[in-house]
C-alpha cells in the first residue's frame, strides 16, 4: 500500500492538501537553511510536505519506507521522509541533497559519488548521498547494514561502495580524446545535489488537475452500466471519463518504430475488461484526495465473463476468448480464436532423426517467473495545452517520439500539434517503452482544457504495469560422443497476459539469438505467445532472451555432464564463428545481421582463466555446505530488427562549444555521456564543452528511442556522422578565410579543429628569385610554416555552422557475454553464497570503461535478483499478491557480490569508433550460470526461477 499526503491508504498515489482544512495544523521548521511554515493534514508525511513546498530534491519511490529514495536528514539523522510524520517537524532542521551542497560547492560525499560514477539513472542518488553523508570512516566496514534502507536498481552497488570509500573511477578528458576514457557524466553534480529534474520535478502549473482510476475488480467482465452522477456532484471534480468518452481507435501500449509490430487490441477505456485493475473509469479533480473520493462514488454494473489464467489452457479448444471479436486482418492477432497473439513453428534438418541417432540426449522443461522492472521512479505524465493550443506531455518515457506518434494516431491529431518530452527518467529496463499514462492524460486534458497529472503508485507498478513475460521452455538436445551438437529443439510458451504489447516481438526475439549462437544441422523452434486474464506482460531487459537462454544454457551444461566434457570446451566446439550463418530454423532467411566483429572466443578464455584464479572469499565450512562452479554464454544483436532511426544535429556555438540535438532519452543507459564523448573526440574538444538537447519532439530531430540497446550504435553513430560533417564545414570555411585550400596543399599541413577555432598551417615564401628568364633562377624556396588560428567569431561571421547526421539501424552486428559463478550452497537451508562472479563482454571499442563496467554490474545484479528471489505472485484468479517492495525483494547492497568484469579486445566495423551496445546483454547469461553452479554443488538441477531457498532446500533433499 502507499501513503498519500493525507495519511489515507490507497493505490493511486500521493494527494495534495488542497481543500483539506478540518483538523489540520501548521508546522514551522528549517529546510536546507530556510524556514518553512507549512500546512499539515492529519497523517501527512514529511515527503509530501517537502514536495508540496517545491523541494524536488526529495524523490518518491515507494511511499512505504522501503527504498530510501526519499531519504533526508532530520537534525542530522537519516530518515525515510515518506513515513516520517509531518506533525513532528516543529522546530526541527531538515537537510536534503540540495542542502548538503551545490554543483559549484558540493559536499565531499557528493563529489565522491561523481568521481566514482556512483549512479546510473540517479533517481536513488539524492537519498543515497544523504544517507552516506552521515557515515564515518569506521562505518565503511558496515555498509551492508547501514545501506539496507537504500535500494539502487541500476548500479550493482560496487561504484556506490567505491564512492563511500573514497575510490575514484573517473578521469579528466584529454582534448579530442574523450572516447575511450572513463569521463564523468555531464549531469553528475546536478544529480548528486538533487537538482537534476526528473519527470515531476518542476513547479506544477496553476489549476493542475489530478487523475484517480477505478480499476476492474474482475479478471474478465463487460461493463453493463456505469453511473457517474454521484462522483460528478462531489466538490472539485471536473470530469469522470468512461468508455463512452474514449476514442474508438484500437492501439497497443507497446511502442516500436513500426506500430504494426504490436497488435491493435486495446482502447484508452474499454467496455470489456480483461484483467484485474484494468481501467474502468478515470476521475479528474482538483486534488488527489478529491479524485479518490469521487472514484469511490462511481457505481458500475458488470457482467462477469469466464476467465483463463494458464497459457496452456488458454490455447485449448473451448477456452474463454479474450479478443475473439477481433480479426487478424485488423488487429494483427495471429489466432484470436485460440488466444494466440503470435506463433512460430519452423525446422531445418530433421530433429527427431537426429535425436534418435545421437550418442547423448538431454531433455528438460524450465519455467521462468513474472518479474517487475523495479524502476524507482514510477510512471508519470503531466499534460497541458500550450498558448497555441498544442498538446504538451511531459512524461517518463524511453520513447518520446513514438509516444507522440501514437497519441496523434489514437486521438486523430496532427503530429505537429503534439509535443512530448522527457527530462531525466528514473530507470526503464523496457518498462517505459510503453504508453501507460500518456493516453489517459491526453483524454483528460482534451476533455477539461486544464493541465492534468497522472502518477502511478508503487502498488500500480505491481498491479497494472506490464511485467517480464513468464515462460515455459522445453529444450531437447542431441550430440555425438565428441560433443558435436546434432539436434536442438526449443518449445517455448509464454504468457503475454490480457494484451499483446510486445507479445510478438518478445516471442520472436527470445528464440532468435539464443538458438542462432549454436551451430547445429537440425534445429526446430515451436513458440507461441498466448493471451490470459493475467495482467499484461511487456518489454524487459533482454527482451525474452534471458528466459530462453536460462533453459538452453542449463541444457547445454547438462549435456556436458552427460558427455564428460568441460562446459567451456563444449561451447567452444559448437558456437558460431565468423563465416557461419546465424541460423534459427531457416538457413535461407534474409537478414541484416552480420559479423561486425567477434569476441566470443576471447570472452570464453577470459572467464575460464579468471575462474581458475584464487577465490575472493573462502567457502563456508561445515558438513552441509557444498561448492560448485558454473558458466553460461549469450549472444545478442546490437540493435533491434525492422529499423531503428536517429536524426541528429551538431552546431558550433559562439563561445566555441557545441550544441548537439538527439532524441534519445537518458534513464541510466549512459548515452548522454557517450554522446558528448563522441562529439568531443570528433571536434577536438572536451565533453564539458558539449551541451545536449535531447528527448524532446520540439527541440530534437526524430529518434525511435532508447530501447534495444540502440543509444550508442544508432544515435551515437548518427552523432558521429554529424560531428564529422560539421568538422569538414568548419575546415572549409577556415580555409576560405585563410586564403584557400591551395595554400594547404602546397606545403602546409592539414587544418585542425581545436578549442577556439580551426588552426590552418601553410608554407611561407622565403628568399627571392633571380630575374625572369635568368639562367641561375631557382624559383622560390619554402620558408618557415605560417600558422593561423581562424577564430570562432570569424567562422560564424559567415553564418551558422550546423550539420546533421542520420542512421537507420541497419545492418546489425552481434555482441557476446560469458558469465561464471563459484557458489556455496547450504543443503540444510537452501542458502546460496556467491563466492565468485565473473563476466566477460565483447563490446567492441569500449568508449567509457567505468560506465560500461557499471552497466555490466547492474545487469548482473538485476539478474541475480531474478535468479534467486524476485517473483511477482498471482493467485489462481489473476489477483496480484505482490504489491509493495517489502514483499518483492529487490537486490540490496548486502545481496550482490562484486563482479569481476573483463572486456574482449575487438573493433566493430558497424558501431561508432568500433563500439557495440551493452546495456541489455549482461543480464542474459547470469541466471543459467548461477543455476549451473548450483547444479554442480548439489548434484541436482534447478528447473524453475527463482531458485529460492525453499525450492533449493526441497531440491537438495
Predicted regions mapped to residue ranges:
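Signature of N-terminal electron-transfer/Fe-S-associated modules in redox systems
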Residues: 2-176, 193
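Glycine-rich loop/linker segments at domain edges
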Residues: 117, 181, 187-193, 255-263, ...
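Flexible, low-hydrophobicity surface segments
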Residues: 165-333
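Extended active-site and interfacial segments that coordinate phosphate-rich ligands
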Residues: 189-190, 211, 296-309, 398-401, ...
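C-terminal catalytic domains of large/alpha subunits in multi-subunit enzymes
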Residues: 244, 412-417, 447-452, 506-638, ...
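Phosphate/diphosphate-binding loops
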Residues: 279, 286, 450-496, 717-752
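Helix-loop-helix junctions that connect adjacent transmembrane helices in secondary transporters/permeases
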Residues: 321-411, 575-657, 881-892, 900-902
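Thiamine diphosphate
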Residues: 428-449, 453-455, 671-678
Amino acid at each position: 500500500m502507499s501513503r498519500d499526503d493525507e495519511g489515507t491508504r490507497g493505490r493511486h498515489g500521493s494527494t495534495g492538501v488542497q481543500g483539506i482544512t478540518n483538523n489540520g495544523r501548521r508546522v514551522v521548521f528549517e529546510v536546507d537553511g530556510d524556514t518553512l511554515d507549512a500546512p499539515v493534514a492529519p497523517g501527512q508525511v514529511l515527503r509530501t510536505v517537502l514536495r508540496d513546498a517545491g523541494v524536488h530534491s526529495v524523490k518518491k519511490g515507494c511511499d512505504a519506507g522501503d527504498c530510501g529514495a526519499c531519504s533526508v536528514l532530520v537534525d542530522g539523522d537519516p530518515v525515510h521522509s515518506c513515513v516520517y510524520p509531518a506533525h513532528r517537524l516543529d522546530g526541527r532542521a531538515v537537510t536534503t541533497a540540495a542542502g548538503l551542497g551545490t554543483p559549484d560547492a558540493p559536499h565531499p560525499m557528493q563529489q565522491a559519488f561523481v568521481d566514482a560514477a556512483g549512479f546510473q539513472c540517479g533517481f536513488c542518488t539524492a537519498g543515497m548521498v544523504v544517507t552516506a553523508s552521515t557515515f564515518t570512516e569506521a562505518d565503511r566496514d558496515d555498509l551492508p547494514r547501514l545501506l539496507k534502507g537504500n535500494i539502487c536498481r541500476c548500479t550493482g552497488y560496487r561504484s556506490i561502495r567505491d564512492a563511500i570509500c573514497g575510490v575514484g573511477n573517473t578521469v579528466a578528458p584529454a582534448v579530442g580524446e574523450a572516447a575511450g576514457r572513463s569521463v564523468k557524466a555531464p549531469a553528475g553534480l546536478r544529480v548528486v545535489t538533487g537538482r537534476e529534474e526528473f519527470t515531476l520535478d518542476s513547479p506544477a502549473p496553476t489549476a493542475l488537475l489530478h487523475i484517480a482510476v477505478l480499476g476492474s475488480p474482475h479478471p474478465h467482465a463487460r461493463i453493463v452500466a456505469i453511473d457517474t452522477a454521484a462522483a460528478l456532484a462531489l466538490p472539485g471534480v471536473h470530469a469522470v471519463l468512461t468508455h463512452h468518452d474514449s476514442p474508438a481507435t484500437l492501439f497497443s501500449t507497446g511502442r516500436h518504430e513500426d506500430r504494426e509490430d504490436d497488435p491493435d487490441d486495446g482502447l484508452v477505456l474499454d467496455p470489456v475488461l480483461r484483467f484485474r485493475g484494468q481501467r474502468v473509469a478515470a476521475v479528474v479533480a482538483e486534488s488527489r484526495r478529491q479524485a479518490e473520493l469521487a472514484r469511490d462514488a462511481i457505481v458500475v454494473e458488470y457482467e462477469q465473463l469466464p476467465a483463463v489464467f494458464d497459457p496452456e489452457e488458454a490455447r485449448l479448444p473451448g477456452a474463454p476468448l479474450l479478443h475473439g471479436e477481433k480479426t487478424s486482418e485488423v488487429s494483427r492477432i495471429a489466432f484470436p480464436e485460440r488466444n494466440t497473439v503470435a506463433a512460430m513453428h519452423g525446422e531445418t534438418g530433421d530433429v527427431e532423426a537426429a535425436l534418435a541417432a545421437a550418442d547423448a540426449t538431454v531433455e528438460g522443461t524450465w519455467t521462468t517467473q513474472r518479474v517487475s522492472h523495479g524502476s524507482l521512479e514510477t510512471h508519470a505524465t503531466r499534460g497541458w495545452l500550450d498558448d497555441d493550443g498544442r498538446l504538451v506531455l511531459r512524461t517518463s518515457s524511453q520513447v518520446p517520439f513514438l509516444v507522440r506518434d501514437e497519441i496523434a494516431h489514437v486521438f486523430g491529431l496532427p503530429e505537429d500539434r503534439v509535443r512530448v518530452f522527457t527530462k531525466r527518467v528514473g530507470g526503464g529496463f523496457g518498462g517505459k517503452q510503453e504508453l501507460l499514462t500518456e493516453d489517459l492524460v491526453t483524454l483528460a486534458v482534451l476533455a477539461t482544457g486544464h493541465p492534468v497529472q497522472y502518477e502511478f503508485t508503487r502498488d500500480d507498478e505491481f498491479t497494472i504495469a506490464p511485467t517480464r513475460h513468464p515462460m515455459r521452455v522445453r529444450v531437447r538436445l542431441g550430440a555425438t560422443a565428441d560433443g558435436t551438437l546434432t539436434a536442438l529443439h526449443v518449445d517455448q510458451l509464454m504468457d503475454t497476459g490480457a494484451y499483446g504489447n510486445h507479445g510478438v516481438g518478445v516471442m520472436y526475439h527470445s528464440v532468435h539469438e539464443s538458438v542462432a549462437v549454436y551451430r547445429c544441422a537440425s534445429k526446430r523452434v515451436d513458440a507461441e505467445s498466448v493471451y490470459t486474464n493475467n495482467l499484461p506482460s511487456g518489454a524487459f531487459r533482454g527482451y525474452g532472451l534471458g528466459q530462453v537462454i536460462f533453459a538452453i544454457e542449463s541444457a547445454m551444461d547438462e549435456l556436458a555432464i552427460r558427455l564428460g566434457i568441460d562446459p567451456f570446451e563444449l561451447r567452444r566446439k559448437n558456437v558460431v564463428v565468423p563465416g557461419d550463418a546465424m541460423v534459427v530454423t531457416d538457413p535461407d532467411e534474409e537478414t541484416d545481421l552480420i559479423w561486425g566483429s567477434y569476441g566470443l572466443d576471447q570472452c570464453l578464455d577470459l572467464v575460464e582463466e579468471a575462474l581458475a584464479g584464487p577465490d575472493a572469499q573462502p567457502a563456508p565450512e561445515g558438513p552441509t555446505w557444498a561448492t560448485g562452479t558454473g558458466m553460461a554464454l549469450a549472444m545478442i544483436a546490437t540493435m533491434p530488427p525492422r529499423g531503428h532511426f536517429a536524426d541528429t544535429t551538431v552546431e558550433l556555438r559562439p563561445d566555441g562549444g557545441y550544441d548537439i540535438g538527439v532524441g534519445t532519452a537518458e534513464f541510466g543507459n549512459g548515452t548522454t555521456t557517450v554522446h558528448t564523448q563522441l562529439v568531443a573526440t570528433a571536434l577536438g574538444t572536451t565533453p564539458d564543452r558539449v551541451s545536449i538537447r535531447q528527448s524532446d519532439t520540439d527541440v530534437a530531430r526524430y529518434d525511435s528511442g532508447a530501447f534495444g540497446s540502440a543509444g550508442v550504435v544508432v544515435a551515437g553513430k548518427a552523432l558521429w556522422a554529424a560531428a564529422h560533417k560539421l568538422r569538414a564545414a568548419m575546415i572549409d570555411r577556415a580555409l576560405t578565410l585563410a586564403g584557400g585550400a591551395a595554400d594547404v596543399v602546397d606545403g602546409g599541413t592539414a587544418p585542425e579543429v581545436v578549442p577556439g577555432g580551426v588552426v590552418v598551417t601553410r608554407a611561407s615564401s622565403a628568399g627571392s628569385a633571380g630575374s625572369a628568364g635568368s639562367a641561375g633562377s631557382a624559383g622560390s624556396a619554402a620558408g618557415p610554416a605560417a600558422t593561423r588560428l581562424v577564430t570562432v567569431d570569424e567562422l560564424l561571421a559567415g553564418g551558422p555552422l550546423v550539420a546533421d547526421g542520420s542512421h537507420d539501424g541497419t545492418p546489425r552486428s552481434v555482441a557476446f557475454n560469458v558469465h561464471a559463478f563459484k557458489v556455496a550452497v547450504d543443503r540444510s537451508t537452501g542458502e546460496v553464497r556467491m563466492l565468485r562472479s565473473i563476466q566477460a563482454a565483447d563490446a567492441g571499442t569500449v568508449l567509457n570503461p567505468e560506465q560500461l563496467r557499471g552497466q555490466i554490474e547492474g545487469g548482473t545484479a538485476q539478474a541475480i535478483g531474478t535468479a534467486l528471489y524476485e517473483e511477482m505472485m498471482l493467485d489462481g484468479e489473476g489477483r496480484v499478491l505482490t504489491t509493495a517492495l517489502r514483499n518483492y525483494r529487490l537486490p540490496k547492497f548486502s545481496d550482490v557480490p562484486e563482479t569481476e568484469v573483463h572486456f574482449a579486445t575487438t573493433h566493430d566495423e558497424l558501431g561508432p569508433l568500433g563500439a557495440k551496445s551493452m546495456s541489455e546483454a549482461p543480464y542474459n547469461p547470469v541466471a543459467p550460470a548461477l543455476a549451473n553452479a548450483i547444479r554442480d554443488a548439489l548434484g541436482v538441477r534447478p528447473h524453475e526461477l527463482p531458485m529460492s531457498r525453499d525450492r533449493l532446500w526441497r531440491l537438495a533433499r
